[in-house]
Amino acid sequence: MAIIEQSAATKKVIDGIELTPKVVTPLSQPIFETFEQERQHRKEKLAGAMRIFGRLGFGEGVAGHITVRDPEFTDHFWVNPFAKSFRYMSVSDLLLVNHDGDVVYGSQPVNRAAFCIHAAIHQARPDVIAAAHAHSPYGKSWSSLGRKLDPITQDSCYFYEDHTVITEQGGAVVVEIAAGKEIAAKFPKGKAAIHQNHGLFTVSETVDAAAFWFITMERTCQAQLMAEAVGTPKLIPHEMASYTRDLTGFPAAGWLQFQPLWQEICRTDPDLFD
């Protein structure tokens, strides 16, 4: 009896909950039973990502777009309409466009450049579900150098040996299908591309990951521009850069990194679901 009482007395309890190891379920990507459910989810994430881009100052007039492949009609993709503010994007605003550039769902015009470049990327790469592009300040500044990013920070390792520089059509407004295909042909793999004198493109299996890769790539451009303004950055060795990329740079990790931003925009902008 004395032993039992002593054991009970040593229990650690807060708010009536015994402090013992618990089975905790990690965050994971949702699984859908129907195309309709998955379509709605992708559209919600697209509208939310657009609002986040607007909040972060990535809007530049009518430039910029995020696309996501339709889960059922995979040769079609959803995209933000032309000349609609990133910061006020809602699910009901989104357009469905085919690979001929026709709007097949929705009543607003589509950005011709969004069609020409993104359609070509989606066609060339079946692995790409979502693609993001904007005329963000540091991305377009860095693109003028025509260089890849260096592994100078832990975050920059997301892109180590996993992004490319595209010089074709650099600086030109791409409104021809052939020009879009020329760009896409130089982006056969990897999560990101720097289009010279234009800006950044990121792709992934989810809107979440494509959006996060864009956000962190923009900040990586900023970090390298700042570092090189005052000196010569020390590079992370190949072994460490590769290790960090493999540990943190895969699609599910990009999805996870986006979740705090998603939680915030859902709380502050519930009308995005309209």
Which residues does each predicted region cover?
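Class I SAM-dependent methyltransferase SAM-binding "motif I" and its flanking Rossmann-like core
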Residues: 137-179
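Short hydrophobic-aromatic micro-motifs
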Residues: 68, 77-80, 166-167, 194-195, ...
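Short, intrinsically disordered, mixed-charge
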Residues: 123-126, 147, 185-188, 216-219
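A general structural signal for well-ordered alpha-helical packing
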Residues: 118, 139, 180-184, 214
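An anion-binding catalytic pocket shared by soluble metabolic enzymes
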Residues: 36, 43-132, 139-152, 157
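A contiguous binding-surface segment within folded domains or other stable secondary-structure elements
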Residues: 164-202
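Divalent metal-coordination and catalytic microenvironments
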Residues: 68, 121, 135, 183, ...
